[in-house]
Each structure stands twice: as C-alpha cells, then as structure tokens.
UniProtKB/Swiss-Prot annotation:
Domain CN hydrolase, chain residue ranges per copy: 5-275
Residues that hold ATP according to the record: 357-364
Reactions mediated catalytically: deamido-NAD(+) + L-glutamine + ATP + H2O = L-glutamate + AMP + diphosphate + NAD(+) + H(+)
Identification of the protein by name: Putative glutamine-dependent NAD(+) synthetase
Cross-referenced HAMAP family: NadE_glutamine_dep
GO molecular function annotation: ATP binding; glutaminase activity; NAD+ synthase (glutamine-hydrolyzing) activity
Positions of the catalytic residues: 45 (proton acceptor), 114 (for glutaminase activity), 175 (nucleophile), 359
Originating species: Schizosaccharomyces pombe (strain 972 / ATCC 24843)
Protein family membership: In the C-terminal section; belongs to the NAD synthetase family.
Length: 700
C-alpha cells in the first residue's frame, strides 16, 4: 500500500517587529504551499515576530500582536485545508516560551514550546524564553480572551506532544534541538513519528551549511523518517543574515533544497513522499525493541489526512526523486551572503544608496566588489520578474519607471566612492581606486585631505606652541601616531559629509549609508584608528579574515569579470599615513609586527579553541615548533595579546558588521570580554618558563 503525502517547507525574509509584513509573507507562503498541492506547511522559527526581536520578546505587546496576527492567518480563507506549523512566542503561566503553533481550519491543535534553547555564539534565547524541560508533559493553555472569542476555542494543549493524523504521525523539533546530543527526533522516531518538522532561525556562517545538512541526513539515515527543515532568510534588522537553505529529507536522501542566498521574500519547496517507505526503512528488530522500552508521547488526534487519495494506489502522484546536495564554496558564500544582507539593509533603511571611502587597498576593494555583486543579484531578480525587488529599486533610485537590468547602471545610481588622498598617497593606489570605480560604475570622487589635516595641526600649534613631526622627520612615536590619526579621522568626517550631500549634488533626494572596510584580523589586533573610516553605518567585511578576502577576490576576478582585482591582490597592504623615504615604506604587517596569516591563526585559537595566552603558546609550539624557536613562538604570542589587550576598547565602538565567521570579534553579543586589560604578567611568566624548558630540552 502506498500513502503519498506532499509536504512543504518555507523560507521567509521576515523583519523583526514587522507584524503586518510578516503576516502577509506567511499567508503568501501558505498559498504557495497549497498551489504545490501540499497538505502540510512548515515555516521558520518565530516567523510571526521575526527571530531577531531580542529584548522586544520581554514586552507584553509582542505577545499581544503575535496572537492578533495568528488569528488573522488561520482565519484567512486561503489558509484552510492545510496543516499549518507557525512560529511565535507564547506566554504560559507568566513564562515566555518560544513556540510552534500547529493549526488546522481555524483551530489550534497544539502549542509546542521549545525544549532546548540556544545560548551560544550570537544566540541568547534563555534571556527571553523559558525552556520546556518536561519531556512528554502536556498541560492546558488558556487562550487570551480575544483569541478565544475569535477562534471559538477556550483552551489548547501545550507541551511535548505529537500529532496523530489519519495515516501518519507528525512530531516537532525546533532548531537547536537538532544540534543537541540527545535530539528529540530519536525518541519520537522510536514512538512512531514518521514526519519531523524543524523550524529554525539559523544565521549564515562560512561553511556552516554542511553541518546542518549532515545533522539532518544522519538523523533520517539512522532513525528513518521524513524531515522538513525551514529557516528564515535575510537581514531581519541586525548583524546576522539568515541563509535559508530549507530542506526536505527522507530516509537519508535529500528531496528538495531551497536557495541559500536569494532576494525572494517568500520561497516554498515541496516534495511528495510515500509514508510506507519510512515503515519499510525501520524494519530492524533493534528499532522496535528500543521503541517498546521507551515511554510514549501524548498523541493529539487529528481527523485529517495528509494524503488526499484514500485508495491503495494513487495513480496521480509520483514520489519525488532524490537530488544532490548543493554546498557553495566559501568564496561563493562571501560573494552572495554579504551582498544580500546589504540589499535588505538598504531597502529597509530607506536610504538612497551607499558611500564608500575607496582607498585603493584590498579591504575597501572587497567592500566595493560586494556592492557590485549586490547589484548583479538585484538585476538578475528583476530579469526574473521579482515584483518586490523592482518596487524597491524604483523607490531607492527615485524613478517609478526605472527598468534597466544593467548592474553598472544601477550601481551608478546608488553607489558613491571617493579616494581621499593625502601627500602620502601613492599614484598606484589612486589609480587602482579610479580604475575599479570606472569598471563597476560607481559615482567616484577624488579629494585631497591635506587641507583638513594641516588645519588641525596648525590649530594645535597655535594652542600649544609645538608642531608635531613624523618619525621620519625626527618626531617621537606619540607625534608620529597622532599625525597618522588626524588623517584617518578626517576621512571619517569627510565621508559622512559626502554621504549626506552627494545625492543633493546630483539632484537626487535622500542620504547615503556609509560603508566601513575593516576586516576581522585588523579588528582583533586593533590595527585601526578609533573613529576613522572603520567607523561607519555598517561593514560587510568586518567578520571576514584577510585570508578569506584574498580568496574571495581571486574568485571574483573571474566570476564577476573584474581583472583589475589582480592588482589589488599583488599590492603590499599599507595605510599610507606616513611619509615614504628611500629607506622606509609603510607596511601593515611591519606596523603590526605579525602577518595576516598569523593573525588568522591567533583569532581561531583565541575564539574557536578558547585559548588564553598560555594554552595558545602550547598549541603553537606544535604547529610552529618545526620552523620557530620556543622563544620566537613565545614572543609572537605575547605580542599578540599585548596589542589585543591595549586595543580591546576599540571593539566597543566597532561598526555593526556582517557576521560571517566563528572567530568574529563583535563586542555587541558575540565576543563578550572586558575592554580594560592588565598586562598579562602572570601568563607571560608562565609562557617564558615553558619556552625556557623547551629550549633546554632542545639543546640536550
């Protein structure tokens, strides 16, 4: 006997606190799921509110408006005759829960609270929600009065239960629960659950998709079953980009996969599966023996068939064939992820475009290429008749008839660049900036900042009677650093002025978002001036290492047809803030006292491996001991932590950056540390003592 069910998983570009917009996107996804003949629709985690509401989850208004939206959704005529799984926060016994609402034909069947909350990395769910730490316990939830009147329903079961439909059993697993060692799907599978639904609010990190795919594949390969994974997509108001990639697996095989990076506000994937194949897959006696020894879940009986055809054989349905999993290269992830994040931020901020100080170096070049990538993605969406994208483009450029799908033409409307040179700038950097801007089509300005910086120096001399000098002219380190910082900070001031007025110069309305271009390695080392060009509105590369940026530009050179990028890759990274002499040319790595490759290693050990100075030294002795002496390794570690400690305060004012990597330094909520450090005296003594032992052993 065959029992074909068609099931749908959604990825929605929700916006935190945009209740009306979120409701419309949810309804659109339900309509699309029905158009694909699905009888079950699963949406992202907390889709009614948007996942990123943060402390708004502590406000009673958030719960009130969520119920209003839910009533509107499940009463909608287009949302009937399909089993709905909708995510929203619910308050039960004065406790806030992250919940799934399972509803059918205007009635709520079950409220399933999240059992295991996510509290690592960027996640702080226990700050807002209480976990349902009572396996298989179900209580009665009394609906708010206005909801009870609207639905003609006073109570609903709340807790860890499963749905018994006419021909199959449905169980719920929410995001983090999949990642835990003892995931709920294990016990649910042993109790006969055949369809698992997982709503997620999982953000993008380079190479993270592989982890999700492996977990779902392994779960269904081991336990058998049909697994629907739904994820939010887009920038919902913060540093994170939720990268979709909704999936449907059956017995270890992928049947459908949503796009990871896309501008579509609503995307629905579906698959048709024979439930009997799950039962056949679970033939092992050990599966049954383990099942009968486990306590049972409470079953909520639902008189609804997920399979529309009730005879033994359905000649009108064909099961979905397995497909290959799509995993992008890290370079592709950098090309598309930050670009889509930039577009969401731009259209939702109602700005007129972006302004970027284009220095002619690799970092600002990377940011410019990401904006160009964004315009290519936008124009492709317009070619595919995406009405929402077209509407947003016309509003941003201020032309209700705009229809061009030329990325360079669009970029010229909304992207402004400026080379802010000084007497220390080289012809090469100025030329590279101009050529890149010409190649991608930005509105480019070339300005000299010497007038501004000399005015500040003259004012200081007038007040103090002393004129600071560069080190090459006999000045002290303090003078040398101050003169560099004046140049850097004047660029920030000038950048915001240009962002405010350049659209006016061209006869356009609105102002621009200022883009920053400091990479994660420089932020970690503190190799940036506080309140210079690193201070901006947003930074698309602030979570990406120099090493990954170089790989990205090598990829973009071919993929985006930008041969000029090779010149940026070949150039020596330099701030160009000091005079160049016959014996001295400023270099970033020389200034820092460490290479970008070394910084990347330090960053991974510090954050991912959770190493302090001493354990980092012991780790690096294994990695670098064959080419460096113990004292050299010790010196590098001590130097890194010295500069990390004295510059940590800069992270507290860091421009909001696209979160891209697990070694990020975002002080907002990802990398929480003090910003006033001691001198690591005890740690340094321990490192020196161990280095001495290593060297004594080597001399024997």
């Amino acid at each position: 006997m065959e029992r074909y069910v068609t099931i749908a998983s959604c990825q929605l570009n929700q916006w935190a606190m945009d209740f009306e917009g979120n409701r419309l996107r949810i309804i659109d996804s339900i309509k699309e799921a029905k158009r694909q003949n699905a009888s079950l629709r699963v949406g992202p985690e907390l889709e009614v509110t948007g996942y990123g509401c943060e402390d708004h989850f502590l406000e009673s208004d958030t719960y009130y408006h969520s119920w209003e939206m839910l009533c509107s959704i499940i009463h909608d005529p287009d949302c009937q005759d399909i089993l709905l799984d909708i995510g929203m926060p619910v308050m039960h016994k004065a406790m806030r829960h992250n919940c799934r609402i399972l509803a059918l034909n205007g009635k709520i069947l079950l409220i399933r609270p999240k059992i295991w909350l996510c509290d690592d990395g960027n996640f702080r769910e226990s700050r807002w929600f209480t976990p349902w730490l009572r396996p298989r316990v179900v209580e009665t939830h009394y609906l708010p009065t206005f909801v009870a009147k609207s639905l003609n329903q006073t109570t609903v079961p709340i807790g860890d239960a499963i749905l018994q439909c006419n021909e199959t059993v449905v169980g719920v697993e929410t995001c983090e629960e999949l990642f835990t060692p003892n995931s709920p799907h294990i016990d649910m599978a042993l109790d006969g659950v055949e369809i698992f639904i997982n709503a997620s609010g999982s953000h993008h990190e380079l190479r993270k998709l592989t982890t999700r795919v492996n977990l779902i594949q392994n779960a269904t390969e081991k336990c058998g079953g049909i697994y629907l994974y739904s994820n939010q997509r887009g920038c919902d108001g913060g540093r994170l980009y939720y990268d979709g990639s909704s999936m449907i697996f059956a017995n270890g095989k992928m049947l459908a996969q949503g796009h990871q990076f896309s501008l579509k506000d609503v995307e629905v994937i579906s698959a048709t599966v024979d439930v009997d194949t799950v039962r056949s897959y679970r033939f092992q006696p050990s599966h049954g023996i383990q099942g009968v020894t486990r306590p049972s879940y409470e079953r909520i009986h639902v008189n609804f068939s997920l399979s529309s055809y009730q005879q033994d054989y359905d000649i009108y349905r064909k099961p979905t064939d397995p497909i290959e999993v799509t995993i992008p290269l890290p370079e592709e992830e950098i090309t598309f992820g930050p670009a889509c994040w930039l577009w969401d931020y731009l259209r939702r901020s109602h700005a007129a475009g972006f302004f970027l100080p284009l220095s002619g170096g690799l970092d600002s070049c990377s940011t410019a290429v990401l904006v160009y990538s964004m315009c290519r993605i936008v124009c492709k969406a317009m070619e595919e008749d995406d009405a929402q994208v077209l509407s947003d483009v016309r509003r941003i450029v201020g032309d209700p008839s705009y229809s061009s799908t030329d990325p360079k033409k669009l970029l010229n409307h909304l992207f402004y660049t400026a080379f802010m040179g000084s007497e220390h700038s080289s012809k090469e950097t100025r030329s590279r900036a101009k050529e890149l801007s010409s190649l991608i089509g930005s509105y480019h300005t070339d300005v000299n900042i010497d007038t501004m910086t000399s005015a500040v120096v003259k004012l200081f001399a007038l007040v103090t009677g002393k004129t600071p000098q560069f080190r090459s002219n006999g000045g002290t380190n303090a003078e040398n650093l101050a003169l560099q910082n004046i140049q850097a900070r004047s660029r920030m001031l000038l950048g915001y002025l240009f962002a405010q007025l350049l659209p006016w110069v061209r006869g356009y309305s609105g102002s621009l978002l200022v883009l920053g271009s400091s990479n994660v390695d420089e932020c970690l080392r503190g190799y940036l001036t506080k309140y210079d060009c690193s201070s901006a509105d947003i930074n698309p590369i602030g979570g990406i290492s120099k090493t990954d940026l170089k790989s990205f530009l090598r990829y973009a050179k071919e993929a985006l047809d930008l041969p000029i990028l090779q010149e940026f890759l070949d150039a020596t990274p330099t701030a160009e803030l000091e005079p160049t002499t016959e014996s001295y040319v400023q270099s970033d790595e020389a200034d820092m006292g460490m290479t970008y490759a070394e910084l990347s290693v330090f960053g991974r050990l510090r954050k991912i491996s959770k190493c302090g100075p001493y354990s980092m030294f012991t780790q690096l002795m294994h990695q670098w001991g064959d080419r460096l002496s113990p004292s050299q390794v010790a010196e590098k570690v001590k130097r890194f932590f010295h500069y990390y400690g004295i510059n940590r305060h800069k992270m507290t004012t860091l421009t909001p950056s696209y979160h891209a990597e697990t070694y990020g330094v975002d002080d907002n909520r990802y990398d929480l540390r003090q910003f006033l450090y001691p001198s690591w005296t005890w740690q340094n003594k321990k490192i020196d003592a161990l280095a001495s032992k290593f060297e004594q052993h080597q001399r024997k």
